[in-house]
């Protein structure tokens, strides 16, 4: 029983500190505003109606009766918000506007008019956390001391005039599934707001996000129509953007965006701060393959941030801004009949005063597709159905209508193949969809998003260089007729090939515009920014750590061990450092095999590396099996206040590790299984169990 008391004390002692760290996440590094979100004449072609952070004033000025707030990390929630706004306007006559939730104040929500409605489309990021742009709203609305302009307390139901709709985007492989929408919904209800319809939840972990969204919104619209006395009408396409070809400009004009991410980059004067909306064009100073087996490649790259204001801490993430593969750009332009005018200059303007143009303008069709639009993503059923009206013939139209209305048929023909929009349409007909307005494509496809990778170096050891470790994705799905190629990792492989002497890089049949717009990436450069993380080493290096990192999940732990080796070289006391690493075979994909030997020499007995090779015997062995085999070691380190880290696959490995750890605690302490699970939950909430996982 004394052992249990010790662990309880450990858990409780760090609970407060961990909670503070959790709830202040993101407030110490502000997210820069998107330079394309503000629309002066060069962006939307119209002046914005004021710069007020007062959403009620904004709605009054622009004649809106429906605002759709979004909290988005990767762009999906923003896309859903835009789709809801468009559908609400076209089907029900709502005067809608889409709003980034961080761009408005919340203290006056108690003044929200009863004849208007607010939507909250909120993604949950990581382990139940708000997205970067929703941190302040989350802290405000769920705070114990929340107060509004009209005064009063929560007991006074200050939001009684607020009608709202809620949809959350989550992943069931994480413990705190859809925590953001659930907690915000509970807070709004507690404050007296009236939810219309049920709070929807989409599950990316189950692969049903899109269908969850579609299934939720129809009964939601019915409930909203009744609550606001809306009349449904036949929807027809009404463009959000006006796209015009500008014959007075050519791609050679220095005012035309050819892939530059910001105006500063266009003008050749990029300046910091570098952020999610303003990348640094960083030189790649080293690139190599850690292994190459059949169609599997794993890259190690060193990216220089010397001479910039970019900084990172061990455990942070680096974002790579990708470029679409040339073959997919060509496919897209051909499918939509744009090949012959790919280099024509276009201007894009928002028809509505509140509409944000997602890509810079003026630009060209080619640049828009290559650098700004997510043309390689799996296509949604709803978007495919919108193209029926523009089908090249009746037979094609009939097929698209069927795909749009029959989710099982769509799943069989499109989802199972992991088709992007151009591939999906090519599977239906060889005829081009020349009548599809380019504005519809801008509206229906997300803006291309940066991809995040765990940094695999220590900022203490190399503050001016960031290491990344990435497996190049090239996968043939069961039943699929083509190989699905990762956009960013194949781009990185092409850069590696070019840097290492290949004059015509062609990774897995993909070609890329490696030199970038106007050759601004020449010399092997890539656009990047840094995202800070709470996945951190203990401040006291003598504290033990246990790391679980199979495959490229070992990336941050290379940085952790690199840092501890440097601290030991300085004469600091370094505690037990245990790594559980797994891969297929020791002579095939054992990442950083030689480096571990060097670190072992530097750290001596304090470093212990335990391996699991899944394909060296008939019975597959994974890291969770090794964890169980070393239960006594794990239990002893936990008693010494060890921090437990997991990095890698969320759907299988991370879940299994979580389960096994609970079993270890229970078995080693003679406790019921439920108590072991409870202790793991306490470790999570206190910050002594940390995850950097993906699905």
Curated annotation (Swiss-Prot):
Membrane topology classification: Single-pass membrane protein
Swiss-Prot/TrEMBL GO biological process terms: ergosterol biosynthetic process
Ranges per topology, Cytoplasmic: 32-695
Reaction equations catalysed: 2 oxidized [cytochrome P450] + NADPH = 2 reduced [cytochrome P450] + NADP(+) + H(+)
Spans traversing the lipid bilayer: 9-31
Region (Disordered) location: 497-516
Domain (Flavodoxin-like) ranges: 66-221
Domain FAD-binding FR-type: 277-538
Binding residue positions for FMN: 72-77, 123-126, 169-178, 204
Enzyme class, spelled out: oxidoreductase
Top-level lineage group: Eukaryota
Binding site for FAD: 451-454, 469-471, 486-489, 694
CDD domains, sorted: CYPOR
Cellular component GO terms, alphabetical: cytosol; endoplasmic reticulum membrane; mitochondrial outer membrane; plasma membrane
GO molecular function: flavin adenine dinucleotide binding; FMN binding; NADP binding; NADPH-hemoprotein reductase activity
Function: This enzyme is required for electron transfer from NADP to cytochrome P450 in microsomes. It can also provide electron transfer to heme oxygenase and cytochrome B5. Involved in ergosterol biosynthesis.
Similarity annotation: Belongs to the NADPH--cytochrome P450 reductase family.
UniProt protein name: NADPH--cytochrome P450 reductase
Natural source organism: Emericella nidulans (strain FGSC A4 / ATCC 38163 / CBS 112.46 / NRRL 194 / M139)
Gene: cprA
